[in-house]
Amino acid sequence: MVDKRESYTKEDLEASGRGELFGAGGPPLPAGNMLMMDRIVKMIEDGGSHNKGYVEAELDINPDLWFFGCHFIGDPVMPGCLGLDAMWQLVGFYLGWLGGEGKGRALGVGEVKFTGQVLPDAKKVTYRINFKRVIMRKLIMGVADGEVLVDGKVIYTATDLKVGLFKDTNAF
């Protein structure tokens, strides 16, 4: 049985990366530097703009984060693809939270828009995921719209983020 809390700490998310949070069959989050959030502050099954689920997570920003030292030298900015990946990570995490089993794989995105950036002097990135569709049959898949905010301002939007869970990824 999945522990369906409304919030998760960094330690919980790291446990997910080791396969300890959702059990042996549940989808793990990435580990180490590729885990793009420090906490999940809200996770509900019947909320969000489409009433199919909502997730909100946060990443604390400081100038010592690994990507600022290499992207770009003399012009540090968080790569936009990391914000996009964070949204996919949260879609997969939600599927595991619902009891889905398998390894998460991003399946696509409808449209992504960047209207701002994350710089080293920012304090916090917030991710908001609003689920549009969840399939929990032989096919396990989530479809959601997402936003990335920096210090309260929306800077990225994505429509139709798609993640599937696969028990066998060799045929993927």
Swiss-Prot record:
Task: Specify whether Lipid biosynthesis is a keyword of the entry.
Answer: yes
Q: Which UniProt keywords are given for this protein, alphabetically ordered?
A: Cytoplasm, Fatty acid biosynthesis, Fatty acid metabolism, Isomerase, Lipid biosynthesis, Lipid metabolism, Lyase
Q: Where is this protein localized, as stated in its record?
A: Cytoplasm
Which reaction(s) does the protein catalyse, per the Swiss-Prot or TrEMBL entry?
a (3R)-hydroxyacyl-[ACP] = a (2E)-enoyl-[ACP] + H2O; (3R)-hydroxydecanoyl-[ACP] = (2E)-decenoyl-[ACP] + H2O; (2E)-decenoyl-[ACP] = (3Z)-decenoyl-[ACP]
**Chief site of localization:** cytoplasm
Q: Which residues form the signal peptide?
A: none
**What disulfide bonds does the UniProt entry report for this chain?**
none
Q: Does the keyword Lipid biosynthesis apply?
A: yes
Per the record, the similarity remark reads: Belongs to the thioester dehydratase family. FabA subfamily.
Name used for this protein in its record: 3-hydroxydecanoyl-[acyl-carrier-protein] dehydratase
User: What species does this protein belong to?
Assistant: Yersinia pestis
Instruction: Kindly list the organism's lineage.
Output: Bacteria, Pseudomonadati, Pseudomonadota, Gammaproteobacteria, Enterobacterales
Which gene is annotated as encoding this protein in its UniProt record? fabA
